[in-house]
Amino acid sequence: VTAFQVDHDPVRPAVGYRFDWKGRSVVVSGDTALSANLTQNASGADVLVGESLAANLVGMGRQAALAQGNSRMAKILADIPDYHATPVEMAQMAREAGAKLLVYSHHV
């Protein structure tokens, strides 16, 4: 098992994991934006379990928070896209890394 740093600022440390066993590999991205380190650690993985951000849903949540006068929650929701990958971004990264299978998790 290898732990590696991922980009989830402002939360630090944040890590992903690579599990290698008998020539097979599974990478779990954890909460992250895309980064060269994630791509490198996902290189050639049999399975990449990657998070995905539904930006439209987060945007709807932000609008609802604003409508209720909850500026703190609106700010949190406005910042979420800065440290999470979209499904398309994760798919592009998985292709670049040569991962054989991408499984989405942690749908934000």
Predicted regions and their residues:
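Flexible, acidic/histidine-containing loops and adjacent segments that form or flank the divalent-metal
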Residues: 2-13, 21-24
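N-terminal post-signal-peptidase region of extra-cytosolic proteins
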Residues: 3, 29-32
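Cap/insert and terminal regions of metallo-dependent hydrolase folds
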Residues: 16, 25, 33-108
